[in-house]
Amino acid sequence: MNPNQKIITIGSVSLTIATICFLMQIAILVTTVTLHFKQYECNSPPNNQVMLCEPTIIERNITEIVYLTNTTIEKEICPKLAEYRNWSKPQCKITGFAPFSKDNSIRLSAGGDIWVTREPYVSCDPDKCYQFALGQGTTLNNRHSNDTVHDRTPYRTLLMNELGVPFHLGTKQVCIAWSSSSCHDGKAWLHVCVTGHDENATASFIYDGRLVDSIGSWSKKILRTQESECVCINGTCTVVMTDGSASGRADTKILFIEEGKIVHISPLSGSAQHVEECSCYPRYSGVRCVCRDNWKGSNRPIVDINVKDYSIVSSYVCSGLVGDTPRKNDSSSSSHCLNPNNEEGGHGVKGWAFDDGNDVWMGRTISEKLRSGYETFKVIGGWSKPNSKLQINRQVIVDRGNRSGYSGIFSVEGKSCINRCFYVELIRGRKQETEVWWTSNSIVVFCGTSGTYGTGSWPDGADINLMPI
């Protein structure tokens, strides 16, 4: 090949390579522009629809990086929109309960600024769990903590922290409330907050951080609600509220709420005679609550709520090992599913139970008369057989010598089933402990387990003599 031919050949090859590179650059440019505009096409509405001006909850925000000849292209995957929870999975099969969380609020109050609280509970959004309580508008090491044994003052607010974080000075005050309930519908939190005069209180309904609705007292005698989580199914949340006598006939209503707006109110129906402080859980496709009869029964009332047609059915837990305090001893106590047992019916304490086929899991104070100690167990046939008393899988959560208090249920959705968990309020201070002038609490939390477990006792643990007066 002569020199001229070599020059022509080299020139041709160079021109070909240059052309290929030019085409590749054009392809890269087109791809970059296409991906840049395509990310804005996600979930765009048809031309005949209006895009609603509402906040979007982003669950995932994934960035993929693709390398092409030293050019970086970022492609953003469209975020999946949050969906309402439907709680359609089955209930987890459990053998008992395992320790989950303890906040040690009273012990920490001996040397730090921790809120004075009572009426705690736990509820979870799809990602994490939170603890709630009704604060008294003061920390424990503060003269305002004097006489905080009282339930209803205008200074009480609903506090909210991630589970396991005590209520420190930076805690969010969600609303003004001396009675409350909270739940997450899959998109946002709903808070039901009751405050005001005993004879004319107001319940505010706060959804996604905004006041959406309210309702006033209908019986003019201490409007009150669950003091534990409400339940939302497919966007409809239910909350049980009572107004009227705490030791006689009262007026209980079940409110149905969608994104903070009351859409229906159903009166209590069925055989339950007195219903307060319900502990509710999803039982697809409805909601089931186990409550407190403060008038006639030491057996606990059941309220079944149909979310679709707003119908209500009520009865009592069948187990002859009853769940309220005070109560008769186990050899003398009874329950026949339909009516209050008229045994130690006055007074009572918030508690919980849940069905497991024909059986029932339940928790209660160990003491029959006082809010001290705490135990859980399963009663064979306790959900369906009148006066059933065969107890298995008993666990001590707090030993008899230490104080307990309210307790309630909350539900956690796993990959394949819905687990039931409970918390126990560990009350300290007045009225029983007169060395101090305050009344407050810490909590301990357990969740259902299908595994094995050991034994123990998890009391509050604060030495009252080391506490601020």
Swiss-Prot record:
Region (Head of neuraminidase): 91-469
Listed GO MF terms: exo-alpha-sialidase activity; metal ion binding
Regulation: Inhibited by the neuraminidase inhibitors zanamivir (Relenza) and oseltamivir (Tamiflu). These drugs interfere with the release of progeny virus from infected cells and are effective against all influenza strains. Resistance to neuraminidase inhibitors is quite rare.
InterPro entries, per the entry: Glyco_hydro_34, Sialidase_Influenza_A/B, Sialidase_sf
UniProt keyword annotations, A-Z: Calcium, Disulfide bond, Glycoprotein, Glycosidase, Host cell membrane, Host membrane, Hydrolase, Membrane, Metal-binding, Signal-anchor, Transmembrane, Transmembrane helix, Virion
Pfam families listed in its UniProt record: Neur (PF00064)
UniProt-listed GO biological process terms: carbohydrate metabolic process; viral budding from plasma membrane
Sequence intervals crossing the membrane: 10-30
Bilayer topology term: Single-pass type II membrane protein
Obligatory cofactor(s): Ca(2+)
Post-translational modification: N-glycosylated.
EC number in record: 3.2.1.18
Glycosites: 61, 70, 86, 146, 200, 234, 329, 402
Intravirion side: 1-9
Residues the record lists as binding Ca(2+): 293, 297, 324
Family: Belongs to the glycosyl hydrolase 34 family.
Domain comment as written in the entry: Intact N-terminus is essential for virion morphogenesis. Possesses two apical sorting signals, one in the ectodomain, which is likely to be a glycan, and the other in the transmembrane domain. The transmembrane domain also plays a role in lipid raft association.
Purpose: Catalyzes the removal of terminal sialic acid residues from viral and cellular glycoconjugates. Cleaves off the terminal sialic acids on the glycosylated HA during virus budding to facilitate virus release. Additionally helps virus spread through the circulation by further removing sialic acids from the cell surface. These cleavages prevent self-aggregation and ensure the efficient spread of the progeny virus from cell to cell. Otherwise, infection would be limited to one round of replication.
Entry protein name: Neuraminidase
